[in-house]
């Protein structure tokens, strides 16, 4: 499949009237050093503390029958190599049960280990947070079973529940308490939960599809209050909200949800991950558009600009549960293990993330500067007019994530458009500085009082003052 790569150009804006030049002999001011802000992050012990978690939902499947056809297993060497080659470093095996599908679970662990991929595994012997619910077993038995999983270097933790409803929170709390009682806090072994978001109505936040009996409706804020109580001890927070809908529209609550999550996880001293819409239509759901490269860049870039410490693609594989969907529409790989064009988009995006994650993981998010228009409304809360040495932003529509990086200022400049190519974003500083600029995984050393960045649709560029 032909790989599409947008052209990437980086230039320095030369303002001779202000005495700004790009020559190596130019005198620059050393950037001030500020008190270091506290940072909350989660990384896998096996991968290192400077490797950002980049994941995929739905690990490769065992074989199954579909409409008279047998779909071969995608739990293969080739497919797991593809996970690693795409730049993902963890995968969620939400439908592979270590208890009931042991052989495929073990094979998944072994292949993930071979390709340095971490894996969250389901194990219904320990508990079940899907109906019929099953509380976590006694601590001693839980600990013994957990040791079986820990034999595999690819073991990231256990899969808990995707998109739990409020009426299920008592079950979550019992399981979460037992898990962290046994697993402990001083390691990266985690229990995977994924939260609901503004995609759901207030009634669904509490009682789901009518299965619960909570009388009052919850706002998302109330849902999060109860969610954090139920998942006390969690090592990260993650949620999904898919923005590309209805033939070119954006979900209007996208940035509102990002800001809310940023604020609430800061209160809880938790890092947060987002989901990236890696496909569309899903199970023939026409509401969800199939994203192009600019849309996927935009999802990742805006998440990072708001301080996300990791992200995941939905879906990575084409899951069995989407049996109505056409292969190749809903994820990075199709039903038969074939790579879609979005696999290549993700690979390019993830390559850039791997070049900047050592900075963003170790940076405290301080707010954003928004310039121009936006495809979805940006809340006033969290917005800044300037940040430290950066005094103004000009040019095309943009979001600038503002960070404290070990006492220095760092900025993540994003083209806030999924279609505008060669967008010009001008960063104006209060003096002449030296900068490290990382764009499309390439690093540049630049000097000046202003920088002009030329960005592809949705692209993000990291700027660190030296």
Label for each model-derived stretch:
Residues 11-14:
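Secretory targeting and sorting signals
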Residues 16-19:
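C-terminal motif of bacterial Sec signal peptides marking the signal peptidase cleavage site
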């Amino acid at each position: 499949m032909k790989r599409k790569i947008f052209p990437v150009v980086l230039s320095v804006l030369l303002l001779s009237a202000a005495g700004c030049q790009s020559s190596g002999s130019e005198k620059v001011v050393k950037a001030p050093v500020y008190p270091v802000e506290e940072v909350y992050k989660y990384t896998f012990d096996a991968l290192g503390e400077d490797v950002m978690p980049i994941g995929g939902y739905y690990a490769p499947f065992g074989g199954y029958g579909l409409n008279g056809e047998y779909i071969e297993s995608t739990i293969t060497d080739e497919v797991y190599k593809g996970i690693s080659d795409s730049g993902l470093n963890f995968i969620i095996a939400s439908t592979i049960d270590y208890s009931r599908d042991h052989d495929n679970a073990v094979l998944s662990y072994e292949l993930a280990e071979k390709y340095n991929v971490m894996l969250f595994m389901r194990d219904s012997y320990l508990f079940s947070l899907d109906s019929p619910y099953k509380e976590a077993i006694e601590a001693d038995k839980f600990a013994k079973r957990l040791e079986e999983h820990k034999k595999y270097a690819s073991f990231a933790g256990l899969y808990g529940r995707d998109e739990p409803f409020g009426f299920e929170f008592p079950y979550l709390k019992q399981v979460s308490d037992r898990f962290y009682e046994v697993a402990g806090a001083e390691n990266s072994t985690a229990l995977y939960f994924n939260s609901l978001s503004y995609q759901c109505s207030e009634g669904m936040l509490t009682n789901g599809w009518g299965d619960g009996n909570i009388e009052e409706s919850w706002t998302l804020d109330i849902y999060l209050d109860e969610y954090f109580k139920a998942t006390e001890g969690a090592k990260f927070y993650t949620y999904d909200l898919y923005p590309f809908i209805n033939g070119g529209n954006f979900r209007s609550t996208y940035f509102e949800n990002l800001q809310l999550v940023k604020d609430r996880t800061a209160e809880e001293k938790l890092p947060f991950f987002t989901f990236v819409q890696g496909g569309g239509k899903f199970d023939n759901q026409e509401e969800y558009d199939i994203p192009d490269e600019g849309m996927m860049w935009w999802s990742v870039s805006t998440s990072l600009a708001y301080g996300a410490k990791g992200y995941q693609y939905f879906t990575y594989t084409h899951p069995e549960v989407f049996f109505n969907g056409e292969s190749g529409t809903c994820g990075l790989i199709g039903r038969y293990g074939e790579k879609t064009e979005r696999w290549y988009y993700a690979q390019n995006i993830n390559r850039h993330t791997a070049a900047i994650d050592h900075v963003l993981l170790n940076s405290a998010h301080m707010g954003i500067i928004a310039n121009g228009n936006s495809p979805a409304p940006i809340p006033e809360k969290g917005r800044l007019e300037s940040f430290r040495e950066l005094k103004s932003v000009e040019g095309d529509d943009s979001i600038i994530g503002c960070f404290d990086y070990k006492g220095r200022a760092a900025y993540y400049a994003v083209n806030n458009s999924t279609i505008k190519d060669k967008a010009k974003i001008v960063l104006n500083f209060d003096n002449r500085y030296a900068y490290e600029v990382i764009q499309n995984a390439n690093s540049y050393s630049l000097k000046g009082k202003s920088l002009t960045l030329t960005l592809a649709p949705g692209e993000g560029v990291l700027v660190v003052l030296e």
